[in-house]
Amino acid sequence: MARAIKYSKEDILEKSVDFIKAYGYSKLTVRELANYIGCSTQPIFKNYANFDMYKDELKLYLRKDYSAFIHKYVDIKDYLYTISYAYAFYAKKEPNIFFTLFMTDFAGSRTVEEVLNTDRNIETINAMVKQYKISLEDAKKVYREVRFYTHGIATQLCVNSIKLNDSEIKDLIKNNIEINLRGINYEFIWKKSKTKNIL
């Protein structure tokens, strides 16, 4: 009699990521995953007491996949641009994972403030202060505008509603960063002139 193959949590999570990349999160059920792995549902339920526990660990595992991808492209000397490009490129390269993480309620919903205050985003904002020689407040403003602009590009790439090559993605992001940095400078000049008029 052939020995039963044992599946660890790691095995199941790896196969889950492969399944989502191929078919999307909406198709993921215990039965469909078991069929994809080539086993019964027993190994899945042996590792997870219920589907919610499995989803919690899957969420972390998908974020790990995303973080590993982003890490390959980020340059701390040009943090805002490189992380924005990586975000949009991930949406193009791994649309099903991107959709799951950023276009459904699977990973939960956040306020703008909560988005700005994640560890990676705080790191990006602090790097912007050094690179662009702007205040922390201005760095947050620019980051917020660029972040959500880039998300717009990424969502269109994800659902294939726009065709952009690599060069076009880069140019769109670079131009938006420049526009927002000029906007900060203009706002500073405008406030200064307004103060003079009051005096």
For each feature predicted by the language model, list its residue ranges.
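C-terminal peripheral helix-coil segments that are non-catalytic and often amphipathic
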Residues: A127-K130, K163-L199
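Alpha-helical DNA-contacting segments of helix-turn-helix folds
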Residues: I20, M53-L62, F98-L101, R110-N117
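The alpha-helix within a helix-turn-helix
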Residues: A34
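Hydrophobic alpha-helical connector segments
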Residues: I70-N96, L136, V146
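Amphipathic alpha-helical segments used for helix-helix packing
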Residues: Y90-R110, A127, I153-K163
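Amphipathic alpha-helical packing segments from all-alpha helical-bundle domains
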Residues: A107-K133, K140-R144, D171-R182
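Hydrophobic alpha-helical segments that form the core
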Residues: L136-V159, K170-I179, K196-L199
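An amphipathic alpha-helix adjacent to DNA-recognition modules
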Residues: K6-V17, S26-K27, G38, F45-H71, ...
